[in-house]
Amino acid sequence: MKRIVILGAGESGAGAAVLAKVKGFETFVSDMSAIKDKYKDLLDSHHIAWEEGHHTEELILNADEVIKSPGIPNDAPLILKLKAQGTPVISEIEFAGRYTDAKMICITGSNGKTTTTSLIYHIFKSADLNVGLAGNIGKSLALQVAEEHHDYYIIELSSFQLDNMYNFRANIAVLMNITPDHLDRYDHCMQNYIDAKFRITQNQTTDDAFIFWNDDPIIKQELAKHGLKAHLYPFAAVKEDGAIAYVEDHEVKITEPIAFNMEQEELALTGQHNLYNSLAAGISANLAGITKENIRKALSDFKGVEHRLEKVARVRGIDFINDSKATNVNSCWYALQSMTTKTVLILGGKDKGNDYTEIEDLVREKCSALVYLGLHNEKLHAFFDRFGLPVADVQTGMKDAVEAAYKLAKKGETVLLSPCCASFDLFKSYEDRGDQFKKYVREL
């Protein structure tokens, strides 16, 4: 009997373990951290052996195949040992893809992928299609394949997940953009990160579709290298050479495969970045044959994504916006660009090799003050202090950051949490960071 070992027992790992067990493999799960009770219960209910708090190498190195959590780096010592002895190391998505014939609509990009994924899922769901949501959001793809049946899966893919995917095929691949992110995981080499993102197109055939932002210089440069077999569906803000989706005369237009149009002001999501998200989602739905009426309705009634430019409250004339999902500089750029008042920006956290020059002009133009929130704010001081803005340095947590921002903000201004950084220095996740922000804003 083939032995499958799963490293990491979160949503992805626990789901992969259930699918492996259901498919008749000897299955073992190992997690260096504590396993959440709900995942222990899931594993126990399927009689799957597990360990937590350590990795017992003799129980792992004898695997025929290993499924690893996206959070484990490829250069972790245990992963290097497995690779050195020739043991295949794959992702949960790669494993799950072997056991379903569903159509796969996969979305990646440095920014916008969660909103676009959620929006595509909303359109498909609103059209009464049998669809699952998976990847970075939703339930584990492997668990859904094991326990449910769907005709379509809408899957958000990070570069970490794409790294360990080899034979998986996206029927529709969406690449929103590529800007520097996670370079600490890619030897601080931008090309390594670009290569990871472009893995979403591997294995695509002439029957498949590749949707991408036409104005992204990196994507355009890489397209010339790759010679893709899939049909290309570029989108842009305005009508231009090659773009099949764009805005013209305040109207959203998609020209292929079926002509579609709607008034831009009817889109539920506002802002330039959200226009791109809506265009990519509209093309995806169009390719799936969803009616124009259903696409229009879903694009106009979508509620948005938590922690992404989420309006929290207005306190004594000051607006508070939660953009905790902005874990890189480019995300913060989009957030600042959308601000219509002077802004107190809360930023900081675990720096991933950030270059803050991208937001320099916007910070000078839009910000009235800055709050640095993190255990190590030296890089922020070195870059931003020269702007001469009032600064608060907070190393204790979100409560103090919110109170500091509130004191710095004037009536009619906005406090924006858009950190540019990962959350893991002071918080469990970007969700935890955003939830704490909302909690302490509401306590003001």
UniProtKB/Swiss-Prot annotation:
ATP binds at residues 109-115. Keywords: ATP-binding, Cell cycle, Cell division, Cell shape, Cell wall biogenesis/degradation, Cytoplasm, Ligase, Nucleotide-binding, Peptidoglycan synthesis. Its EC number is 6.3.2.9. GO terms for molecular function: ATP binding; UDP-N-acetylmuramoylalanine-D-glutamate ligase activity. Cell wall formation. Catalyzes the addition of glutamate to the nucleotide precursor UDP-N-acetylmuramoyl-L-alanine (UMA). It comes from Bacteroides thetaiotaomicron (strain ATCC 29148 / DSM 2079 / JCM 5827 / CCUG 10774 / NCTC 10582 / VPI-5482 / E50). Pathway: Cell wall biogenesis; peptidoglycan biosynthesis. InterPro entries: Mur-like_cat_sf (IPR036565), Mur_ligase_C (IPR004101), Mur_ligase_C_dom_sf (IPR036615), Mur_ligase_cen (IPR013221), MurD (IPR005762). Belongs to the MurCDEF family. It is found in: Cytoplasm. GO terms for biological process: cell division; cell wall organization; peptidoglycan biosynthetic process; regulation of cell shape. It is an enzyme of class 6 (ligase). One of its GO terms (cellular component) is cytoplasm. HAMAP family: MurD. It catalyses: UDP-N-acetyl-alpha-D-muramoyl-L-alanine + D-glutamate + ATP = UDP-N-acetyl-alpha-D-muramoyl-L-alanyl-D-glutamate + ADP + phosphate + H(+). It comes from the Bacteria. This is UDP-N-acetylmuramoylalanine--D-glutamate ligase.
